[in-house]
Design a protein with these regions (language model features):
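Active-site phosphate/pyrophosphate-binding segments
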Residues: 12-24, 29-45, 146, 162-266
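N-terminal beta-loop-helix "entrance" segment that forms/cooperates
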Residues: 66-69, 246-255, 314-315, 319-324
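Short helix-loop-beta junction
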Residues: 66-78, 227-238, 295-301
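Short, highly selective alpha-helical patches that border small-molecule cofactor pockets
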Residues: 25, 62-66, 107, 222, ...
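A generic structural motif
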Residues: 77-84, 124-126, 235-247, 303-312
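Glycine-rich phosphate-binding loops that contact phosphosugars or nucleotide phosphates
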Residues: 48-184, 279-280, 291-292
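Phosphate-moiety recognition in structured ligand-binding domains
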Residues: 1-41, 119-127, 131-140, 145, ...
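Short hydrophobic beta-strand segments
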Residues: 53-59, 206-214, 273-278
Length: 342
């Protein structure tokens, strides 16, 4: 079992092994700006298009798009999880496809089906790619991508859907600024004492993370973070709603203040840690769940770690929570002496 060494979080040599993924995280804001600039011309063509009967989204970040659009979209919205399209989709509908990698076979089948049925197709993909070739039709608008960043492509797509009056206004530049701020705050050159991602990594060093996000977007970020923590540590990490996490928290015996940290290392390693992703949502049910989780953790001497960001739009808050968590996962990997692949 790997032992966490917090000195590695400020060790230049140890951090060099994670440089590629840290650099990619730090460049997230720049990727959003590039994708936005490249897609500006096709997005300017969107306001003149007729309102569709329904919107069907497919590809990476389709559920993220749904989380943003569902509360305000004036037409039915479906996030389609598999290849092809529902049988009812036709020429009156808009098919939205995120394919920043450009070549997933299932999405190619979806695009082919949309073109065959004469649906309006709005696709984010590389200009020169297999899927772009299949997307060619009079009813297709391509938002070109070049960075293979699913979130950057999704933010550009949200900008386009706003121009179609199907979603809320999104300011890609402010989302990019938020990403830049996270990169600065969580920089490998920032000391542990002022770096929220390194601080979280230290909090998660010897525990089993139980990750919770109350709002739809925070819950999505919690699932993404749990995936990253599993990859970083090789240990279990669970993201779930409050009703699923409470029985786990309540079943944990309070910690023994007289336990030997060396002799009892195995059992201590398995103690859970409650990780809260708080985007400032003031819904009474969400705040109630937050209170119940914290109270259960405190009763049983369970550590609570929080990532919070209350400023900006829904998309900015989501991006900030997620990106901070991604940096923390990398630092957890560094502290455990593991190689984390991007």
């Amino acid at each position: 079992m790997s032992v966490f060494d917090d000195s590695w979080l400020d060790d230049r040599r140890a951090l060099e092994g994670a440089d590629p993924i840290l650099r990619r995280l730090a460049e997230a804001g720049a990727r959003i700006r590039r994708e936005t600039a490249d897609a500006s011309d096709p997005i300017s063509e969107l306001p003149g298009l007729p309102r569709p009967r329904a919107v069907i989204a497919a590809g990476s970040e389709a559920r993220f798009i749904r989380a943003i659009l569902e509360p305000v979209c004036p037409v039915p919205f479906v996030a389609w999880p598999t290849h092809g399209l529902p049988g009812w989709v036709g020429a009156l509908d808009l098919v939205v496809v995120m394919a920043s990698d450009g070549a997933r076979p299932g999405l190619i089948a979806t695009v082919h089906e949309a073109v065959r049925r004469g649906s309006q197709l709005l696709i984010a993909c590389p200009r020169i790619s297999t899927i772009a070739e299949h997307a060619g039709s009079r009813s297709t608008i391509v938002l070109p991508t070049a960075t293979a960043d699913p979130l950057a492509a999704a933010i550009v797509m949200l900008d386009g859907l706003h121009e179609l009056q199907l979603g809320p206004e999104v300011h890609p530049s402010t989302v990019a600024d938020a990403m830049d701020q996270v990169a600065e705050d969580c920089s490998p050159f920032a000391d542990v004492s002022v770096n929220p991602a390194k601080d979280l990594a230290m909090g998660l060093a010897e525990v089993q993370p139980l990750v919770w996000g109350g709002s739809v977007l925070a819950a999505r970020a919690s699932r993404r973070l749990a995936e990253a923590l599993r990859a970083a540590s090789g240990r279990a990490a669970l993201a779930a709603d409050a009703d699923a996490l409470l029985p786990i928290l309540e079943a944990v015996a309070p910690s023994d203040p007289f336990a030997d940290p060396f002799e009892d290392a195995v059992s201590a390693d398995r103690r859970p840690c409650l990780v809260l992703l708080d985007d400032g949502n003031t819904d009474s049910l969400i705040r109630s769940d937050h209170t119940r989780l914290v109270a259960a953790a405190e009763r049983n001497d369970i550590r609570v770690c929080t990532i919070e960001h209350w400023q900006g739009s829904d998309v900015e808050r989501y991006a900030t929570l997620l990106q901070t968590g991604m940096f923390a996962a990398v630092y957890l990997s560094v502290g455990l002496g593991r190689t984390l692949l991007s």
